[in-house]
Every structure is written in C-alpha cells, then in structure tokens.
C-alpha cells in the first residue's frame, strides 16, 4: 500500500513556513529533513501548504522526488511555492517523478518567484498531469539553465543545444485538464519555453478546461516565449478564454549552428513547435494572440503543422511582430477552418505580414507545404497587416517557393475577406501550374479581395492592392469577389458548376507573368455577377478582366451579387435611370457569343422600383453614376454595361419597407395618453374619501397595455410601473381640491417588428370636485387635469439574412388629459332603470374625456437611419355609465367597495401621426399610430379600507378595453388626513 501522509502527525508540508536552506520549521512529526524521496507514493494534503524562501540548490535530489509514479492529492486545499531555489543537480527540480507526476483536486497551485538554474526546472517528469484544479498559477519564475549550448573541442566540433529547463518540463507528455477558474502564466523567464519546454517527442494537451487561460509577459532568451518543443501541442474543448499577449523571445544563440536537430532559434513569440503540430481545436471561448514578438520567425505561433479548426469562439491575432517571417503564424502546413469569426489585424513581418507558409519552416527534409482556409460559421478577415521592411506595404499571406495554396473557401453565408493581398512564389526549377480552388468541398460562401479602407497614398502603391496566385484559380461554388480596386493576378481562371465571379468597382482579374513561370491557361467565365453597391458611386471605376496573351470566354448571363435589398434600393442613384460600365474584357480573343444582352432577374422589393438589364452596347441616353457618358468619350471594346430603368418616366417610385415605418414612435403618444389616464384614474380614491381635512396620499401604480395589429398598422404592448403622491383638502360639503405628482417607467414593444421603446414619464395633476344641490336632486361634479412629459428611447433591430442592423433614437412627448364628470341619480328617474337602480343602489354618471399631445422631432443613429418629424394627436370620448357602493360591516377595518361600469365611445379623434424620412435618400412617408376602435368598455373596482379614523388604504383595478385593445391598471396606497 502506498504511503499516505494523512494524520495530524503526518500533515505533509502543511505547516512548513518560512523554510530556509535545510533548516525548515515543520510540524510533520519525527525528524523531517527535506528532500523527500518516495517510491511510488500517494501524498495527501491535510491543510493548505505554503513553502516560502526554500533554498535547495545544494540538494542531491528534488524537494519531493519519486523514482516511479507520484500523485499529490489536494482534497480541495492549496499548494504554494514562493521564492524557492530548485536543486541544480541532474534533472532534479522542486517536484519530480521518473514516471507520472500527478496533481489532482487542489483549490489552487501557485508557483511564484521561484528560481532554477538546473536542468530539471521547477517541475519535471516523464508524464505530468494537472487535473481538477480551480486555479493553476505560475508567475515571475526564473528558469535559466546555463550554458544553453555546448560546443566540443573535437574535430569536427559538435554543438549541442539544451532546451529542457522550464517551469514545466515533461519528457513524454503534459496534460492540463478540468481546470475550473484560471490558468495563469505571467512574467516567467527561461531559455526555451518559459511555461513549458518539452522533448521533441512529447505531447502537450490543454483539454476540457472551463478556466480562463492567460499567458502574458513571458520571455525566453532562445525561442518559444511561452511554450516550446514537443511533437504536438493541443488546446481542445476548452470553454474559457485563451489569451497569449505580450510574450516575446530573443535569439541569444544567434550564430550558433546545432550539429543536428531543428530548433527554430529565436522563433515563436508565444509558441514554438519546431518539428511538431499545434492544434487549436473545438474551443468555445474567445482566443487571442496579441502583441507577441520575436527577432526571427513567427510573432505568435511557429509550428511545422498548424491546425486551427472547429473553434466556436472568436479568434483574434492582432499586433504580433516578427523580424523575419510570419507576423502572426509561420508554418509549413496551415489548415484554418473557423466555426466562429477569425481576424488577423495589424501584424507585421519582413515576409508574410500575418502568415508565412513555406517548406523552409520546420524540418527541411519535409518538402510538402500547403495552405487551406475555410470560413465555416463566421467571417475570416485579414486587415492592416504589413511588411515591416517596407513601410506602407500591406500583406496578408506570403507563400514562398515550394508552398502550395490548396483552397480558399467560405461556407454558406460566411465570408473570407482579404483587405490585404497575398504573395505567392514558385520554385525556380520545374515550376508547375497547379489548381487553386475557391470554395472546395461544397462550400458556397464568398471569398473577397478588396482594397477598401486604404488611404489615397496607399492606393498609389500597386503592392498594396495586388494579390498573386500562381496557379489556375477555379471557383467550384459560391463566389470569388474582386472589388474596390483590388487586383488578383493568376495563371489561369475558370468557373465551375455554380461558381461565380463577382466584380466590383476597380476590381481586376489579370494574368500573372512572373519570370520562369509555367505556361498560363485561358480564362473561362461561366457565371458573372456585379456588385451594384460599389458601382453606384460617383467615383466608381470599371472593373477589368485582362487575360493578356490568353483567351477569354464568357457564357451564361449577368446577375446581381447577393445583397441586402434594403440597402441597395435605398441608394439615391436609383431615383432615375443609370447605366454602369461594369467591366472591360481583354485578351488574345474575347468570345461573348454565349453571353448575349438580356434582362437581370429583379425580385420584388421595397425601396426604389425599376428593372435591371445588361448590354454590350453603350446606352446613349442614360447617364453613368458620375453623371457622364457610360464608358467615357471613347469606351473600350468589349465593355459590358448594366442598366437600371425606373418604373416610371419621371423617377423611380419609392416604397418604404413596413418594418421601417416606425409606428412605435407615433404609438408612444398613445402610451403617453394612457399614462395620463392611468395617473388620473387613481385619484378617484381621494375623491371618494369623505373625511374632511388636509390629506396626503401615496400610491404605487402598475399598468399593462396591448393592441393587436389592425388595418395595416403595427400593434404594441407594454408594461409600466410607478408612483403617485397627492396633497388634497376635503371639505364637509364634499368639495375637494388637490394636486398630485408622480412618475411612470416602462417599455413598449412593437408588434410584429423588433422595436422597443423605453419611457420615463413625469406627471402632474390638478383635480377636484364639488356638489350642486337642487330641490329635487344632488349632482357631484368632478374634474381632473393632468400634464405629462416623457423621455423616450427607441431601439430597433432589423431582420436580415446575414446581419442584424440596429438603430437608436431619443425624443420627448408632451401630453395632456382633462376629464369632467357629473354623477347624478338620473337612473332613478327612468321607469326602465329605476328598479335596477334601487335594487343595486346605482348612481349614473356621464363624462367628457380629452386626451392630446405632441412630440419632438429627432433623427436616429446607427444603421438604416430614419428621421421623424414632430408628431401630434388627440382623442375625445364621452363615457356614460353607472356606479355602486357596498359597505362591509367590519368594526376594526370597515371598507367601502365601489364599482363603476361605463360605455366609452370615442366621438372625435386625430390619430397620432408623423412623417418618417429615410436619411440616406430623404424619401418621406406619412405614418400614423394604431387605429383603436371607437367603442369600448370601462370597468373600475375600487376598495377603501379604514385602518384608523384618519388613515385609509386603497386597492384599485381598472379595465379599459376595446376590440383588439386591452388596458389593465392596478394601484394600491395609503392616505392620511390631518
């Protein structure tokens, strides 16, 4: 049975504090003197362990050492080493095992400020396992073995490089698994791999962790700022963020030539796997490589094979720098398949601003070098990557001679976008023209080359816009889009199946003519599209297809690039007919007999109305987007024109998308009206109290309103809550005068569109009542007048196939409310109603209710901006009904229940209305709020409970409804009379 330190007399290192040299104060029992050499033990901690200032440089073995397996079981406790000196002999370390070294079930493992100058580093073993730990932390450790290389004096001299010493040094494998909260390597220093340095055959795995992984400000003197060596480095199925930032290495062995092996000295600012594979696979959290640097190759990642596949979280490689090759990644074989967004930005290198691919990477004996990129469920973009030896020259990828671009693909609605160009070289001996596939294996998205975002100065340098793909580019599916002055030069071109070439303003597909290149092939275009957005501008430039000495053959028909019809048909250029010279075709021969003039299918849409067509003949009476003749005074031969014809002779009819009406803005006036109404209704409590004196009332109010879409107008629904404070004077003759103030807060949702308006209302009311007594009857006249000011904030999200544009707007409403009501026993005067009135103690009432208001104008910010004019509206109704009161016989808390029932017709109305204007083209459309039905039912149930002689409690429910419209209001509160 393995030895277990469990009892209080054998509490392993649990109380080892302030250890110094070999004289450490412990409470282990017996004569304990480190180091401990165990033969296959399992060690359990019984309390948190802290080892501080332990000096073990002179020890002949590790502090804790096993010649076989060793397991440290934390039982939820912590293990901490701070400011300790590891042994220097052989491969000894602070902790080591000849076989498997396991750390399991710790709340935290923390190594801070430790040092080692030996070969073993801090933790050494054949197989090292960290499992089920909350926090794993290594900070400011120094593991600098010297010398880093040794050259013998024999002839021939043999130079050996020592890569081993590091914080973690596995010879066969390292597994970091099920870490729950944090993994942190900060400010560590070593020769190779400040965090991990492993043998060339070792496998390192970070798998199934939920922790945030942070590797920052680490440094090495010879290679791999954080991780070095091994045959495989795997990050898989991790759900937390993975961050490599501000790591770096230098090349202190510059000039040293190892006699054997591949070391990639001074390469990999974060990761260096000279002859192995790096895999970032199926992770859910965001991954970031930023501000890493190296004086040689690969600012962030150096690997012979690099696979980045299946990651759902965003991947960002930003501002990494290499003095030579690959600002972010340097690899022999690179395979990127993203399930989330991936961005390469602001990386710099001498070659390959973001990525360098070539057979010179890794083991020189392996010559196969390939690049494959697939954007699967998110966009991949290269933007702002530069060559550091040529300021102002942009470059995304450099594929050196011998490297092969296998495919560039995007799946479905995803896009692979190159704002920076690609550079491709071929071998000087026996070069071949190989296929480069766009959208391989059924991918159907967009691969885009664009120079959008370049300054006018950058556009003057051809290298900033020109991509060179030395092979025959074949579009298997989806589209290859060349736009915004980007140039793509190839050795041949063909569309296959549903593959489509899309041209935008200034886009050029040309023939590459490098020295010694293999024979080029003809250009065959079976499906051609154009991007109307880029051409419908005054500074547009015709695209070009130039096959040089080869032939160009076109078949099929011209189509519109897939686009958001809302954006397209809002463009001012489509107010009237326009002709666009979209492309000029050049070559030894240009065959277009299979591409005759024709109509372009134009599905029904909102916005400007008209039809598209295309022709090889210049339209003489229709201007170009810049107002000139299409194609200029002397158009080039083989120019293809796209023509927009308006639906009327004068101008294109404009139809606004109902989703953009924004009737919720007009309906916000209805909400303000209802807010005033709800605020005034609950004043009924004050009017019913017959205790004379000065009264103070405090109430809470909640309301729900819903109106279904009707007659082509939007519906709306909302919930609101607030308070009211009132001051009133009650007289003995039932005369009342009062003043109230309050606020309402709520949110209104449009139906059926995704628009939400939040409101904050401030309300002020003046109210009162007085009796009118005659010989035959008594009438009670009451009035309520309220003013409301509301601040509104609108958020709108539009439904689009590939994006969700959003806009925001703010404005205020001013509203007023007046109610004059007369309560009279007229039901007793009518023979038909008298029996019912006497049986139920009914009293009749008739009222006149006035609602009105106006709202300020405003302009939205964000996408698809709209401007709304000042709006206004009002409504007049004449409620008529009856009320009844019941009294409870309770002595301690008697209550009075009042019920009102009324028919409520709207006799005059001007619906709230505005004018909405589309900002991009100044097209205006009148809109109005919901068209509520004019006949409704009003029910109010009110209960007053006398808590004391001078204090009453209220509970009030009101239903105000029409066909398709419902308004529920609930209030409760207290009143005190002085």
Curated annotation (Swiss-Prot):
Its main location: secreted. Residues 1-24 form the signal peptide. GO terms for cellular component: cell outer membrane; extracellular region. PROSITE patterns: AUTOTRANSPORTER. It is found in: Secreted, Cell wall; Cell outer membrane. InterPro entries: Autotransporte_beta (IPR005546), Autotransporte_beta_dom_sf (IPR036709), Polymorphic_membr_middle (IPR011427), POMP_repeat (IPR003368). Keywords: Cell outer membrane, Cell wall, Membrane, Secreted, Signal, Transmembrane, Transmembrane beta strand. It is a peripheral membrane protein. The keyword Transmembrane applies. Residues 662-978 form the Autotransporter domain. SMART domains: Autotransporter. Belongs to the PMP outer membrane protein family. This is Probable outer membrane protein pmp14. The lineage of its organism: Bacteria, Pseudomonadati, Chlamydiota, Chlamydiia, Chlamydiales.
């Amino acid at each position: 049975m393995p030895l277990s330190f469990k009892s209080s007399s054998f509490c392993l290192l649990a109380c080892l504090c302030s250890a110094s040299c070999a004289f450490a104060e412990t409470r282990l029992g017996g004569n304990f003197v480190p180091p401990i050499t165990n033969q296959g033990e399992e060690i359990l901690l019984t309390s948190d362990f802290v080892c501080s200032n332990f000096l073990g440089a002179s020890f002949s073995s590790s502090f804790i050492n096993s010649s076989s397996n060793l397991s440290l079981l934390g039982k939820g406790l912590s293990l901490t080493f701070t400011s300790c000196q590891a042994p220097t002999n052989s491969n000894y370390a602070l902790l080591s095992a000849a076989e498997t070294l396991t750390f399991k079930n710790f709340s935290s493992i923390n190594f801070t400020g430790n040092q080692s100058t030996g070969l073993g580093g801090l933790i050494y073993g054949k197989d090292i396992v960290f499992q089920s730990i909350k926090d794993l932390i290594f900070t400011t450790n120094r593991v600098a073995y010297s010398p880093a290389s040794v050259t013998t004096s024999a002839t021939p001299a043999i130079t050996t490089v020592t890569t081993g010493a590091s914080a973690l040094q596995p010879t066969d494998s390292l597994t970091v698994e099920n870490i729950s909260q944090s993994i942190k390597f900060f400010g560590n220093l070593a020769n190779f791999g400040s965090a991990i340095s492993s043998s060339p055959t070792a496998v390192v795995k970070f798998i199934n962790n939920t922790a945030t992984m942070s590797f920052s400000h680490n440094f090495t003197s010879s290679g791999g700022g954080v991780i070095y060596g091994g045959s495989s480095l795997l990050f898989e199925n991790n759900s937390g963020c993975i961050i490599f930032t501000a790591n770096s290495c230098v090349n202190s062995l510059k000039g040293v030539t190892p006699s054997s092996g591949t070391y990639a000295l001074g390469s990999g600012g974060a990761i260096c796997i000279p002859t192995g594979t790096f895999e970032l696979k199926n992770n859910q959290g965001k991954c970031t490589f930023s501000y890493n640097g190296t004086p040689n190759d690969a600012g962030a990642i150096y690997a012979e094979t690099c696979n980045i596949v299946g990651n759902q979280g965003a991947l960002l490689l930003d501002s990494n720098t290499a003095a030579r090759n690959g600002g972010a990644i340097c690899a022999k074989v690179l395979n990127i398949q993203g399930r989330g967004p991936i961005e390469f930005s602001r990386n710099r290198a001498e070659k390959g601003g973001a990525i360098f691919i070539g057979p010179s990477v890794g083991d020189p004996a392996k010559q196969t070098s390939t690049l494959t990129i697939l954007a699967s469920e998110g966009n991949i973009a290269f933007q702002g990557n530069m060559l550091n030896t040529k300021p102002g020259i942009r470059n995304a990828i450099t594929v050196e001679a011998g490297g092969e671009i296998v495919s560039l693909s995007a799946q479905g609605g995803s896009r692979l976008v190159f704002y920076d160009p690609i550079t491709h070289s071929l071998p000087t001996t026996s070069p071949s023209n190989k296929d480069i596939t766009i959208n391989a294996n059924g991918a159907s998205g967009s691969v885009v080359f664009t120079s959008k975002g370049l300054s006018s100065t950058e556009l003057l340098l051809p290298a900033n816009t020109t991509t060179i793909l030395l092979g025959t580019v074949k579009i298997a599916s989806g589209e290859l889009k060349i736009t915004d002055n980007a140039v793509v030069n190839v050795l041949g071109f063909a569309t296959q199946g549903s593959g489509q070439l899309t041209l935008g303003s200034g886009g050029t597909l040309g023939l590459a003519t490098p020295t010694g290149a293999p024979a080029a092939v003809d250009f065959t275009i079976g499906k051609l599209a154009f991007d109307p957005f880029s051409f419908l501008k005054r500074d547009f430039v015709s695209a070009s297809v130039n096959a040089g000495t080869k032939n160009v053959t076109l078949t099929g028909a011209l189509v519109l690039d897939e686009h958001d019809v809302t954006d397209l048909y809002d463009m001012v250029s489509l107010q009237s007919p326009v002709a666009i010279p979209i492309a000029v075709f050049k070559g030894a021969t240009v065959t277009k007999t299979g591409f005759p003039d024709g109509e372009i299918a134009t599905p029904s849409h909102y916005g400007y109305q008209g039809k598209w067509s295309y022709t090889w003949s210049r339209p003489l009476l229709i201007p170009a987007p810049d107002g000139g003749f299409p194609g200029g005074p002397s158009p080039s031969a083989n120019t293809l024109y796209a023509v927009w014809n308006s639906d009327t002779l004068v101008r294109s009819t404009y139809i606004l998308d109902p989703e953009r009406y924004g009737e919720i803005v007009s309906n916000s006036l209805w909400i303000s009206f209802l807010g005033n109404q709800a605020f005034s209704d609950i004043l009924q409590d004050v009017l019913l109290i017959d205790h004379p004196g000065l009264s103070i009332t405090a109430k809470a109010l909640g309301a729900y309103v819903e109106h279904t879409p009707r007659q082509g107008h939007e519906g709306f629904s909302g919930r609101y809550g607030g308070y009211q404070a009132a001051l009133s004077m009650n007289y003995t003759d039932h005369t009342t005068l009062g003043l109230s103030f309050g606020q309402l807060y709520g949110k209104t949702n449009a139906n059926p569109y995704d628009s939400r308006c939040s409101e904050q209302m401030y309300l002020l009311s003046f109210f009162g009542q007085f009796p009118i007594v005659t010989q035959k009857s008594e009438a009670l006249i009451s009035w309520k007048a309220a003013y409301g000011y509301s601040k509104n904030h609108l958020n709108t999200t539009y439904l689009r196939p590939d994006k969700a544009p959003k806009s925001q707007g703010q404005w205020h409403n001013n509203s007023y409310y007046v109610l004059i009501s007369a309560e009279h026993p007229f039901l007793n005067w009518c023979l038909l109603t008298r029996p019912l009135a006497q049986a139920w103690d009914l009293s009749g009432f008739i009222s006149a209710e006035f609602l009105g208001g106006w709202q300020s104008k405003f302009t939205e910010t964000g996408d698809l901006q709209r401007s709304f004019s000042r709006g206004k509206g009002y409504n007049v109704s004449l409620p008529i009904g009856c009320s009844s009161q019941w009294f409870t016989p309770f002595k301690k808390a008697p209550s009075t229940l009042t019920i009102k029932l009324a028919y409520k017709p709207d006799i005059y109305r001007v619906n709230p209305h505005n004018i909405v204007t589309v900002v991009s083209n100044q097209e205006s459309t009148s809109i109005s709020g919901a068209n509520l039905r004019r006949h409704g039912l009003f029910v109010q149930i009110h209960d007053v409970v006398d808590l004391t002689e001078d204090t009453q409690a209220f509970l009030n429910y009101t239903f105000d409804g029409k066909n398709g419209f419902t308004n529920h209001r609930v209030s409760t509160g207290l009143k005190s009379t002085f």
